[in-house]
């Protein structure tokens, strides 16, 4: 009887269980609150970066910067942060933005040991393996933007370098000229109607890439739309800009898609695919894969039997993919996987960056009539006349038909306007972040410890008055034509238009060839009038940045 009584006393009641749960929950909440407060105090007052000025909330959590990135406010931050806090600003618990020539030289100088930061985990193309030490190991697939292995990256750049040199790229000018002719003809049919400038620049860029890389057209010019591909792709950068600021979360999402969806929903960066949406990457992948497969089969067959005489239809087209296939055949180090990835990378890396450049250039020139007028005078002095230009007796006036890539270098004012627009509205809207090496960083009388994420925002750096003059915030192409040689060299040196240090854009010459031909060609044929220029708050600027919301008219020149 006593045993039964003892057993009944040892069995807790529901009331006791409830009290225990409440007690444990209270302890957990208190412990969490104490830990949170302790972490906040440490980051705000005891952290090695605590003395660096910056927004107080930024010191506590990366959520501060992520909030602004999610809202597309990186243009505003780039223009205001350093104006308020000075050349060194703490923008996260372990991240610092800098804005000075000294900082630029330290971070982006060749051989200084500053590797890409963990922000780029959000841009990787392949799922990594993870070892027992929680270190990530990415496959060797030629992921140029997100490659963390410096030696591997240098090898990849050396391999593809000859294909993307200016002397090789310019042989594809005729393909770009054909696209320009079709774009001009189609824009003329609009008779000056208002258009979304970014969409039309994207149309032209994708058509140029299709022609240069694959001898193919997506049909965007004839359709007068990119099918929403530019907008949908840009939303992807909104997501990457947020995820990149939380590398631990990004790492976890490699192994848990559910966590990725949850985090996306939490930050409001989940974007459903529109109905009947057709990305251009699908036909690009199929067409490039088909040609590569045929070329590899032919190459394998040539090792076992004599080559039959080439028929006309068997000859390879004169495009970039043909060069990449030949590179694979000539160099074993340029593997089949490299070949397939590089064929797609031309589009993945090029369609948004070139669109961003063209949009900012046409927006700036179209909103500054005096600059546009001077460019037209320069084009006329070189014989580049509108295709519809006639004399007083209505007879066509013969002029230069196409603007040659090499000859474009003589259009000094036009190129100055191009540089100036890219300076003010760079392709990268956030910091080109790097990781401080073991030696640490001493700059502006501050020591920044190893492992800290540091970098310069191109938006900020390109408005630095020490480098670009007192009117650095103004659109003034003449700054690139000034007599002061040292000043011009400094502007070229401390410039992140094409990236920084050893990680500059590998497709720069391809992009320049397209931009240098498209801009003067469009201005020759049309008076570009910007009808809506959004203010800075309205522009959606992420890590990959574009001047959004610009409306313009292309009025045919008579």
Swiss-Prot record:
Binding locations of heme: 505
Protein keywords: Antibiotic biosynthesis, Glycoprotein, Heme, Iron, Membrane, Metal-binding, Monooxygenase, Oxidoreductase, Transmembrane, Transmembrane helix
TM stretches of this protein: 21-41
Known glycosylation sites: 464, 495
Origin superkingdom: Eukaryota
GO cellular component: membrane
Primary site of residence: membrane
Alphabetized Pfam families for the sequence: p450
GO MF term set: heme binding; iron ion binding; monooxygenase activity; oxidoreductase activity, acting on paired donors, with incorporation or reduction of molecular oxygen
Catalytic class of the enzyme: oxidoreductase
UniProt record similarity statement: Belongs to the cytochrome P450 family.
Record's function text: Cytochrome P450 monooxygenase; part of the gene cluster that mediates the biosynthesis of sordarin and hypoxysordarin, glycoside antibiotics with a unique tetracyclic diterpene aglycone structure. First, the geranylgeranyl diphosphate synthase sdnC constructs GGDP from farnesyl diphosphate and isopentenyl diphosphate. The diterpene cyclase sdnA then catalyzes the cyclization of GGDP to afford cycloaraneosene.
Entry protein name: Cytochrome P450 monooxygenase sdnT
Organism for this UniProt entry: Sordaria araneosa (Pleurage araneosa)
Organism ancestry: Eukaryota, Fungi, Dikarya, Ascomycota, Pezizomycotina
